[in-house]
Curated annotation (Swiss-Prot):
Ranges of Polar residues composition bias in the record: 676-689
Domain of life according to the entry: Eukaryota
Organism: Mus musculus (Mouse)
GO cellular component terms listed in the entry, alphabetical order: nucleus; plasma membrane; Sin3-type complex; transcription repressor complex
Protein name: AT-rich interactive domain-containing protein 4A
Bias-annotated ranges (Low complexity): 690-702, 1230-1252
Cross-link Glycyl lysine isopeptide (Lys-Gly) (interchain with G-Cter in SUMO2) per UniProt, renumbered positions: K481, K723, K743
Region of interest (Retinoblastoma protein binding), ranges: 955-968
PTM sites of type Phosphoserine: S679, S719, S867, S1113, S1149
Keywords attached to this entry: Chromatin regulator, Differentiation, DNA-binding, Isopeptide bond, Nucleus, Phosphoprotein, Spermatogenesis, Transcription, Transcription regulation, Ubl conjugation
GO biological process, one term: establishment of Sertoli cell barrier
Amino acid sequence: MKAADEPAYLTVGTDVSAKYRGAFCEAKIKTVKRLVKVKVLLKQDNTTQLVQDDQVKGPLRVGAIVETRTSDGSIQEAIISKLTDASWYTVVFDDGDERTLRRTSLCLKGERHFAESETLDQLPLTNPEHFGTPVIAKKTNRGRRSSLPITEDEKEEESSEEEDEDKRRLNDELLGKVVSVASTAESTGWYPALVVSPSCNDDVTVKKDQCLVRSFIDSKFYSIARKDIKELDILTLPESELCARPGLRRASVFLKGRIVPDNWKMDISEILESSSSDDEECPAEEHEEEKEKEAKKEEEELPEEELDPEERDNFLQQLYKFMEDRGTPINKPPVLGYKDLNLFKLFRLVYHQGGCGNIDSGAVWKQIYMDLGIPILNSAASYNVKTAYRKYLYGFEEYCRSANIQFRTIHHHEPKVKEEKKDFEDSMDEALKEAPEMPLLDVKSEPEENTDSNSESDREDTELKSPRGRRKIVRDANCIKKEIEEEKIEDKFLRDDLENKDAGDDDDDGDPAAKREHELLFGRKSTPKNKEKKIKKPEDSERDSDEEEEKSQEREETESRCDSEGEDEEDDTEPCLTGTKVKVKYGRGKTQKIYEASIKSTEMDDGEILYLVHYYGWNVRYDEWVKADRIIWPLDKGGPKKKQKKKVKNKEDSEKDEKRDEERQKSKRGRPPLKSTFSPNMPYSLSKTSNSEGKSDSCSSDSEADDQLEKSSGGEDLSPDVKEELEKNENAHDDKLDEENPKIVHISKENDRTQAQPSDTLTVEAGDSDQIVHIFGDKVDQVEEFKKQVEKSPKGKGRRSKTKDLSLELIKISPFGQEEAGSEAHGDVHSLEFSSLECKNFSSTEDDIDPYEKEKKLKRKILGQQSPEKKLRLDNGMEMTTGVSQERSDDGAGAEGMKGAHVEQHFETEGEGMPSLTAEPDQGLQELTSEKSDSPAEEEPVHTPLKEEEDAMPLIGPETLVCHEVDLDDLDEKDKTSIEDVVVEGSESNSLASVPPALPPVAQHNFSVASPLTLSQDESRSIKSESDITIEVDSIAEESQEGLCERESANGFEASVASGACSIIAHERESREKGQKRPSDGNSGLIAKKQKRTPKRTSAAAKTEKNGAGQSSDSEDLPAMDSSSNCTPVKRLTLPKSQKLPRSPARTSPHIKDAEKEKHREKHPNSSPRTYKWSFQLNELDNMNSTERISFLQEKLQEIRKYYMSLKSEVATIDRRRKRLKKKDREVSHAGASMSSASSDTGMSPSSSSPPQNVLAVECR
């Protein structure tokens, strides 16, 4: 920055413009460390010499005549040809900040410090982010500090000097020897010095007849004529002369032990001070922050590598003093690749390669660069490290070699550098050998330098010791252990199932706790298998092959889990990722762009892999850490892709499993869906198993596919024990029934059974109910254990945990009511409760599953499985009627007592979740539910509630009406609880009031349904507040459906539901859709049919039904619909009764659907909340025979279910949208969703606002 007329150096107090972070700021010079190099032309012999300003007398300006002391000590006249200011200036800025800068970073105030040609007006328009024009134009004569042009003569001189450089090395006879240098003509004027290689100091010209020496007195370097140098034999000098002449003592000590005198060393404090004060003024000032970060990282790493800090300090002291004495002080820490350069380590690495002169290959320099631990940023790495070495260390290397100065860490056991020519590997081995000899305690105190051991070996050691690697190994081992344990648990679970069956027959004499443990332990992964196995029981050949497939799938899932667990750590060890070319998504929404980038490194953060990516063509300051979901991996990069897939593996695996399940279902669609197989048995076992095992299984089901299988299987979810019991009880009836037989065949057979074996059915059901009670208790315990396991397990996140919690709560709630109902009402009630519980558990698990996928699958399944469900319903209905009639005769007298007991149970269950309502119904209802199991369980509650409602109608009061007046959107969990309580009270009053025997069955049905509803409520609560509200409403509606129907007729929902009970049911269903998007398969299937018949579906529900839910009775295909049906089976049953009674008890679902649709369309435009489309007289049912009544009620139930399924699907859709919105938006959309779902017509009728209310409203008179 110095102009021709500027002084040679600046003085303290001068106002200057100082460069700070790339910009020039006003400052004042505080201190000066003066060092001016003067190139003079000797008049005597017309030669040039480079001397320091303290060797010159006269004005320091170019062209001035001065006196100078030559290398031989004589004083001659000379002309200054060039001045170089190498001083260090400490300046103070306006804000008090201090910086130590070279003269090149300073300029006098008022001087131009920008390039005129580079004003912004003349610059092309470029991205300012990439604007990199320097403030000052680069000097043409870079590296030369003089502002004057270089003359041709000087260039020639320089070239000739370079040619002579090799010759200087030949003067080896005196190298490393202590000599006496004659300072003047007098013989007495001499001083001791050490002859060193001329290569040590490029600034001092050493001619052929001269030698370069370092004085022991002032430690400076001088070029001395050979004639003035005499070899000194200090050992022969007398002690008196050693003491008398300065420097001789130091020379003697050096000669004897090669101990460097103190004046040849710089105080380590000065080194640290200069490095800290000049830390930020390195050439790349723009990257100061980066350098600081890198320096910190290096300091963290150094303790691992530096084994001899004392020797390092000794090295640095000599190096810094050497550089200062030769006129090139190191005033700031050298930087390479934005990291502080470890000169000690660099010196050692080059020494092990035989010295700088022996390294010809750029690859070796590149290796040294990497060994320093500096990231290679560009292709100039080898050149940069070589240049840095030549600048800072080459002279010192020559000095040490010529003076035979060694450092124990570097030259250990090695006499001379020249003799050192070792291969890189040998040096590595030696370094490793030497490392143990160094004091290990010094490692921590090492801030700057590194040791012999190469960074590579250090890195290898650290990698071996790294906790990540260990963690990965442990995780792999854990995965293997988990698989083994799971297989063992599977076997135990199967055995336990067999034992449970025996225990169920023996009234639970076995050890239920152990069974629960096994079932719960195996629950998460075995549940799906068990359900599938249950479904497949009738088909032994298929079952075997399917089981094998499922086992293999389970193993794959466990492996994938293990992989995903250890995957994060794998990324660190996978070298293939570094440098991988990828595409990265940048930005969000419409502004998102994709940039090409390369991965620079990977890192783990809270179990998530982060990638440091560099965008091609962008400055490194745009490098950023991104998550895997923003990276688009190239096709050829399997590793990264797999990693990405593994992260999403839960979803993909579940989707694959679902697809497989669907394919299996399709292959079996020739036959009725597996549900039909159990439908005949459903009356007995469906309720039992579904409640007891089905729920725990579904709740614990690990994958979405498993959940879907459970839903599709509906009644199939029965535990093996229940299945066996069902088969035993119904073998006589159902063995003959084929899944493929039409509904009519099933109905006729069931009618025959009912007529021939009414008493048998009751007894069987009673026994089954006892078993169910045991099983259910076991299931509750299992569910609790399962919850604990789920919480512990890494996968127990989100869906699973929610499902488990719901199922547990449901199970807990239902056991009380079920036990009471079982003891008071009969085994049938228990079976009903279990079925409902199972359905609810299914719905909860289904809710956990992706609503979309579930809906699709359910739709498909329903298309193929409608007939089986219908068959089941018809059969169940027939059996139910027979059971009801028997119960009426048997239980008519004790109906009121039962009612009182039920009411008590109601209150108990209210605290638990409404299962008590279920306990109220009588055995008749129990039979109906057990017979109908899947959906029949839901239908039965409706039938009995209607009857009960007839009896209890006068008892229904404003409380029940108030309970029903609940807005789906407005319901809060608190409101839900209160509503549930009110409904329960109303239902209790209804059940108490109803005296006829029909009431007990109705109550029982409601109870079974209610418990499932309660389960679903719990599940939905865990999932969402909305779903919780709906579920609670469902459970309340179902429990109190007996009274609800009456209440509904009296009151309608405020929002859009015409009848409180129906609206509550709709709410429950909607909430279930949201929370449990899929209810149990059986219930959902029945509901789907009924809903289709019901014209009041919401548009979404109608669509799902059209897709297949409506066509098929299977609830699997209607995920949302299923959930709604599960939640509202009782309500739906009640509604269909009301509708069907006015029409004709014997109407079949298709006709009823059309009629209902027509009615809906008619009623929709003008229907008021109290216009009940589903209302009918219970006495009409009394006029029908058992078969007609069952078929009639089933049809009604199916229609109602369809409607609710549609509502459910719509609610699920709304729920999904709400997830994306903020809380406010969610609440608003929730209200809109519930309203729209209640009022919208899915396609059954054009006007849907009022019809849904009508559909929901059930008038029982």
